[in-house]
Curated annotation (Swiss-Prot):
ISGylated in a CHMP5-dependent manner. Isgylation weakens its interaction with VPS4A. The lineage of its organism: Eukaryota, Metazoa, Chordata, Craniata, Vertebrata. A lipid is attached at G2 (N-myristoyl glycine). It comes from Pongo abelii. The keyword Nucleotidyltransferase does not apply. A motif (Type-2 MIT-interacting motif) lies at residues 168-179. This is Charged multivesicular body protein 6.
């Protein structure tokens, strides 16, 4: 019981699975960063409007420069996300290709084993024997067909028709035994005696 429950199951998580998970986590973090930067850009744009209304043009200009730099960061972040997603797709497709290759390898191994069991020579021998059997049967059919004349064929058909007619005309044989018949001219007292003689015989 201890061995049964104490044995650890072998992990099916591969290095490729770990890499895909890590790449997706980085992608999600970049998207969160994008969202945060986008919200900040909206606030700074509103603040720049307020500064211009207040006549603080230089301050508004400086704020817009910062905003422009953050927009460039946002574009670079989008490119990084695209690269991460492309990498994830490449790894996943490579995993599919590996599965296909494993299937092809297994199929080739099965074919090789089957070829070892039945070689080309064995297949050719079986085909030759089959062809010989077919040819032998064809020769027999030709001999049988050539050994009868038209008169023989007519006689065979006539006999077949006669047998068929006999089967039609013959009465059916009763399946139950016939009842014992006692002659009417025998006296009544003598009838039991006659029945005993019949039974004794």
């Amino acid at each position: 019981m201890g061995n049964l429950f104490g044995r650890k199951k072998q992990s099916r998580v591969t290095e490729q699975d770990k890499a895909i998970l890590q790449l997706k986590q980085q992608r999600d973090k970049l998207r969160q960063y994008q969202k945060r930067i986008a919200q900040q850009l909206e606030r700074e744009r509103a603040l720049a409007r307020q500064l211009l209304r207040d006549g603080r043009k230089e301050r508004a200009k400086l704020l817009l420069k910062k905003k422009r730099y953050q927009e460039q960061l946002l574009d670079r972040t989008e490119n990084q996300i695209s690269s991460l997603e492309a990498m994830v797709q490449s790894i996943e497709f490579t995993q599919i290709e590996m599965k296909v290759m494993e299937g092809l390898q297994f199929g080739n191994e099965c074919l090789n084993k089957m070829h070892q069991v039945m070689s080309i020579e064995e297949v050719e021998r079986i085909l030759d024997e089959t062809q010989e059997a077919v040819e032998y049967q064809r020769q027999i059919d030709e001999l049988l067909a050539g050994s009868f004349t038209q008169e023989d064929e007519d006689a065979i058909l006539e006999e077949l028709s006669a047998i068929t007619q006999e089967q039609i005309e013959l009465p059916e044989v009763p399946s139950e035994p016939l009842p014992e018949k006692i002659p009417e001219d025998v006296p009544v007292k003598a009838r039991p005696r006659q029945a005993e003689l019949v039974a004794a015989s």
